[in-house]
């Protein structure tokens, strides 16, 4: 059953979920259908833009890899194959009902305000759980590891919900996605550090501020043209190649926000229906709809910094001690890795870029450390790409929640108790903080 659900893909499954949620919240059925399908149209459009980005940026990325002389032997296979690997494991087979029931239990007990409908991305929790299982040899510890990751993700979603809503321009949503949520503590820490630096304190340099100060220089189209030119020159392209990249990157800068607007347009009646429903039946209790990080990609800072990080990532990969991962399949979608930095830093370009470099260092190192386990998962799952190189990994598995949970639980029963205790403490602390606000 769950295999069939996953086979529908996000562009079909998410709209169906949205229609069902709309009907639960007493939205007229035709309006619920239109809302769900509109969300689906937005995701289809965004998928097309992502495919265009991958098709256009992959060739110059490969040229840059050759020019930088990268000789790394752990290959990044990307988030798509990684999700398949996650769901092909023993924990992946049970992850949807386990995490869904956890979410419902936390909602009922008021330990979270988020209902995570982004079920497709439960694979992040499956990867964490399976790494724990491979480290410890215990399926039970693995399931506990996945539950810990999911619980932390839900609380990070609650914690950042208002900032996400401000960036996206839509009330009643949050981001519990397994990777995005795991980057939140680091970005919050870095934001506090930036506030201690004199020339960064109290300043917010986003695309709108640049446009206000320097006119058309801050326009997304112009930013896209400049970034495309940088890509072309870095890849040694001639006039034709540079011109093509300039137009393509400018298109990405413009089309991503347009697709996000479609998703937001579809979510508006559902969000409004949810608000009215909970005001009427639950005395105004606030509940968020948990979505994929994709809904944050419309911000110019996320797109611009994400694209800038592509050549930076290749340089980092070549000089970072301990890194063995060759960034490849996940590289064209680099904006996904720093979308929560944009949220935490309120769209500030400089802060988001610095934080992006720092978080990608952690991503490379964790992806390197997880490579043996990820390769073993892929081989056991019968994935053919696992036999094409000595080891494989994915940048998208390099998240800090997965790493910290697996490291603790690898210590055995004491580590498991400590990990569960820390997660429970974080959940209760953030809940107490919410009640005091």
From Swiss-Prot:
Cellular compartments annotated: Cell inner membrane
Domain PTS EIIC type-2: 2-437
Any Pfam family matching the protein: EIIC-GAT
GO BP annotation list: carbohydrate transport; phosphoenolpyruvate-dependent sugar phosphotransferase system; sorbitol transmembrane transport
Membrane topology of this protein: Multi-pass membrane protein
Species of the source: Escherichia coli (strain K12)
Gene: sgcC
Endoplasmic reticulum recorded as keyword: no
Record-given protein name: Putative permease IIC component
């Amino acid at each position: 059953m769950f295999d069939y659900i996953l086979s529908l893909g996000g562009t079909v499954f998410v709209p169906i979920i949205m229609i069902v949620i709309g009907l639960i919240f007493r939205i007229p059925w035709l309006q619920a259908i239109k809302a769900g399908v509109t969300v689906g149209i937005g995701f289809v459009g965004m998928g097309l833009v992502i495919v265009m980005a991958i098709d256009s940026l992959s060739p110059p990325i490969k040229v840059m890899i050759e020019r930088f002389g990268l000789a790394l032997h752990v290959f990044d296979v990307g988030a798509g194959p990684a999700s398949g690997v996650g769901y092909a494991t023993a924990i992946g087979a049970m992850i949807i009902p386990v995490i869904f029931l956890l979410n419902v239990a936390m909602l009922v007990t008021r330990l979270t305000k988020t209902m995570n409908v982004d079920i497709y991305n439960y694979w992040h929790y499956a990867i964490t759980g399976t790494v724990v299982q491979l480290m410890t040899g215990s399926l039970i510890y693995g399931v506990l590891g996945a539950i810990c990751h999911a619980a932390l993700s839900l609380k990070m979603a609650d914690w950042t919900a208002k900032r996400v809503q401000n960036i996206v321009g839509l009330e009643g949503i949050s981001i519990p996605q397994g990777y995005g949520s795991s980057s939140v503590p680091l970005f919050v820490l870095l934001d506090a550090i930036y506030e201690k630096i004199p020339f960064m304190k109290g300043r917010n340099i986003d695309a709108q501020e640049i446009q206000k100060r320097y006119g058309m220089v801050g326009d997304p189209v112009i930013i896209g043209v400049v970034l495309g030119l940088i890509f072309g020159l870095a890849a040694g392209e001639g006039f034709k190649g540079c011109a093509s990249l300039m137009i393509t990157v400018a298109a990405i800068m413009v089309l991503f926000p347009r697709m996000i607007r479609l998703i937001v347009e579809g979510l508006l009646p559902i969000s409004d229906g949810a608000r009215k429903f909970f005001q009427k039946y639950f005395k105004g209790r606030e509940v968020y709809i948990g979505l994929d990080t994709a809904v944050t990609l419309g911000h110019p800072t996320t797109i611009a910094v994400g694209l800038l990080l592509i050549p930076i990532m290749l340089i980092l990969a070549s000089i970072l001690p301990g890194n063995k991962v060759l960034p490849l399949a996940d590289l064209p979608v680099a904006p996904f890795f720093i979308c929560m930095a944009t949220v935490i830093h309120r769209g500030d370009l400089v802060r988001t870029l610095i934080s992006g470099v720092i978080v990608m260092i952690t991503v490379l190192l964790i992806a390197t450390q997880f490579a043996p386990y990820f390769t073993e998962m892929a081989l056991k799952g019968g994935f053919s790409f696992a036999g094409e190189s000595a080891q494989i990994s994915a940048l998208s598995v390099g998240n800090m929640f997965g790493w910290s949970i697996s490291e603790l639980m690898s210590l055995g029963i004491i580590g498991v108790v400590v990990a569960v205790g820390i997660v429970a403490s974080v959940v209760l602390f953030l809940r107490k903080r919410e009640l005091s606000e």
